Amino acid sequence: MGLSRVRAVFFDLDNTLIDTAGASRRGMLEVIKLLQSKYHYKEEAEVICDKVQVKLSKECFHPYSTCITDVRTSHWEEAIQETKGGADNRKLAEECYFLWKSTRLQHMTLEEDVKAMLTELRKEVRLLLLTNGDRQTQREKIEACACQSYFDAIVVGGEQKEEKPAPSIFYHCCDLLGVQPGDCVMVGDTLETDIQGGLNAGLKATVWINKSGGVPLTSSPMPHYMVSSVLELPALLQSIDCKVSMSV
């Protein structure tokens, strides 16, 4: 780490600032209710949702040749067909997808204490939101949680040539804020993208949001710092700056 003070903080979005996993679970529960009450599915409803969750976790598509709506509707269509058999049911798949999507967006919110933290931090440093993912999906989340006003810039991986952990997207973020990599801290919950990316780009520090309290594998990227909640960040940044003051 360099000896300059922190001038900018890059934040991941999903499961760092907003509870994307929790919102997705709420969406799945609504779909289960729909399938059981309207279509009289029984345990198959949960099986279908479990299958979709697996497909989402393995999702891979080219954003310039494929529409995310089509891709995710197909996840539901395939899961229904695999579970129930018979002919494909695109209409039901669309109903499930849009219910899941709308429900989870409703529950993607910035908590009041997170808003307060961002507001206070921005008085001292520049803030940037750096999120991987499909452009449409991530922009919908950003709109849903109304976080735009808390950041000096927002960068969506799906709109760039490369996503995290490629160093190029971090350099782009630095250019937007007029800072050097050694001035910046990356905060996120994913070792393979947020932390590895910050290390690749030579940022001042990386902060891993480790909500589960698990220990990183020896083969995993090693963050400079680890906290259980993003709300611990202000105190950590003060500590980092204090170390700089003592070193110069």
Swiss-Prot record:
Binding site for phosphate: 13-14, 131-132, 164
Cofactor(s) listed in the protein's UniProt record: Mg(2+)
Regulation: Inhibited by calcium. Inhibited by vanadate, sodium orthovanadate and phosphonate.
Enzyme Commission number(s) from the entry: 3.1.3.29
GO cellular component, one term: cytosol
Record field: catalytic activity: N-acetylneuraminate 9-phosphate + H2O = N-acetylneuraminate + phosphate; N-glycoloylneuraminate 9-phosphate + H2O = N-glycoloylneuraminate + phosphate
Top-tier EC class: hydrolase
GO biological process: CMP-N-acetylneuraminate biosynthetic process; glycosylation; N-acetylglucosamine biosynthetic process; N-acetylneuraminate biosynthetic process; N-acetylneuraminate metabolic process
Binding residues for Mg(2+): 12, 14, 189
Pathway: Amino-sugar metabolism; N-acetylneuraminate biosynthesis
Database matches in CDD domains: HAD_Neu5Ac-Pase_like
Task performed by this protein: Catalyzes the dephosphorylation of N-acylneuraminate 9-phosphate (Neu5Ac-9-P) to N-acetylneuraminic acid (Neu5Ac or sialic acid). Can also use N-glycoloylneuraminate 9-phosphate as substrate.
Sequence similarity: Belongs to the HAD-like hydrolase superfamily. NANP family.
Protein name: N-acylneuraminate-9-phosphatase
Higher taxonomy: Eukaryota, Metazoa, Chordata, Craniata, Vertebrata
